């Protein structure tokens, strides 16, 4: 008792064969998803970077400065989520080296000051670029931020 009972292909008369399964460190930890590719280990900023190398023509045409994109200009960018189609609006970040798997939407994206900057929402299938929606920061009439950091998670349109 205590060992898992596994069915074998050559079992006769519906006999069950007991087999011991040993823990394999490489198989277990080697298949675990990671949050980011560790391409910049040891560098001051080891996480994903904004996608400023616009090798993708789609991003090159519609991107703003420093990896910021306007989702409203992506006229053909319809995203599928659990069978429902939707389109993002507003500004966001195009991130490279995210290496996030399906189900990562809603993950927080932090800036170099370890403050929340955006929420991860989607990825392109072709070039491993991820998109994150920027969190709005309230500003005064002169365009100056009222507070250093502010998080407004309510979206309206």
UniProtKB/Swiss-Prot annotation:
Transmembrane segments: none annotated. SUPFAM superfamilies: Trypsin-like serine proteases. One of its GO terms (molecular function) is RNA binding. It comes from the Bacteria. Belongs to the MG067/MG068/MG395 family. This is Uncharacterized protein MPN_589.
């Amino acid at each position: 008792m205590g060992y898992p009972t596994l069915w074998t292909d050559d079992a006769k008369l519906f006999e069950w064969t007991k087999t011991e399964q040993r823990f394999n460190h490489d198989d277990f930890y080697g298949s675990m998803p990671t949050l980011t590719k560790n391409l910049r280990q040891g560098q001051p900023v080891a996480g994903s970077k904004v996608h400023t190398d616009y090798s993708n023509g789609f991003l090159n045409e519609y991107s703003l400065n420093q990896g910021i994109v306007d989702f409203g200009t992506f006229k053909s960018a319809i995203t599928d989520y659990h069978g429902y189609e939707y389109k993002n609006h507003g500004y966001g970040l195009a991130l490279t080296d995210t290496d996030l798997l399906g189900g990562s939407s809603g993950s927080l994206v932090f800036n170099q000051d370890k403050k929340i900057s955006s929420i991860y929402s989607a990825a392109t299938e072709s070039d491993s670029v991820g998109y994150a929606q920027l969190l709005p920061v309230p500003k005064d009439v002169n365009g100056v931020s009222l507070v250093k950091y502010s998080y407004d998670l309510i979206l309206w349109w």
